[in-house]
């Protein structure tokens, strides 16, 4: 269980480095690669991969049976996969949005957080109302991030720079709230 918490904190670190990279590299008037920006994106990648590995290991490494019934984890993952394919088709073919890795990142983050919340609920770490509230917040953050994703190429470069920061800030804040809820549940 501790691995899941550490993994989720590593995802906050990842969002922080990703935001730093974005702010450094895409600062108006034009994108410019820098050594500091390169370091930030490498650290985001490392902390993100480590966070995912630890979170998944934490969810898979729990001993004993869950104390409460939740959603099947594979159902959440399958829902995420279907959502990704539908959004990929909708955004690229119907709305003519250039496909970038951010769509996969948004959906992947949403699935990871919903699985983590489900796991903490099933194992008695979060009350049902807290898990549901946090899940609603995750879904709202994902929707807001998807709106930003869709708007990015339709606005000026300067506005796109700001809009591109929103999902990174939102996800970091949401993960911090979730992590604090898990800590508070222990007290």
Q: Which role does the model predict for each range below?
A:
Residues 43-46, 102-116, 164-176:
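Small-residue-rich segments of transmembrane alpha-helices in multi-pass membrane proteins
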Residues 174-187:
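Juxtamembrane boundary at the C-terminal end of a transmembrane helix
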Residues 149-172:
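Interfacial loop-to-transmembrane junctions
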Residues 8, 29-45, 69-74, 95-106, ...:
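Membrane-interfacial loop-to-transmembrane alpha-helix junctions, especially the N-terminal start
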Residues 20-31, 85-96, 147-155:
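C-terminal ends of transmembrane helices
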Residues 54-88, 136:
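Alpha-helical transmembrane-segment detector that highlights a single hydrophobic TM helix
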Residues 2-4, 63-65, 115-151:
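Short alpha-helical packing/oligomerization segments
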Residues 1-69:
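N-terminal topogenic module of multi-pass integral membrane proteins
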């Amino acid at each position: 269980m501790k691995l899941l918490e550490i993994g989720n904190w590593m995802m906050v670190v990842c969002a922080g480095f990703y935001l730093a990279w974005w702010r450094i590299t895409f600062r108006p008037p034009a994108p410019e690669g820098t050594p500091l920006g390169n370091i930030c994106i490498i650290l985001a990648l490392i902390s993100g991969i480590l966070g995912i590995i630890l979170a998944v290991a934490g969810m898979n490494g729990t001993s004993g049976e869950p104390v409460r019934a939740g959603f099947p984890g594979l159902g959440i993952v399958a829902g995420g996969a279907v959502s990704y394919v539908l959004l990929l088709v909708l955004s690229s073919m119907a709305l003519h949005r250039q496909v970038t890795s951010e769509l996969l990142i948004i959906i992947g983050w949403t699935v990871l957080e919903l699985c983590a919340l489900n796991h903490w609920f099933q194992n008695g770490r979060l009350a049902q109302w807290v898990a549901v509230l946090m899940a609603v917040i995750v879904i709202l953050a994902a929707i807001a991030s998807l709106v930003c994703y869709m708007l990015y190429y339709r606005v000026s470069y300067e506005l796109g720079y700001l809009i591109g920061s929103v999902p990174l800030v939102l996800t970091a804040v949401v993960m911090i709230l979730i992590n604090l809820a898990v800590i508070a549940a222990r007290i």
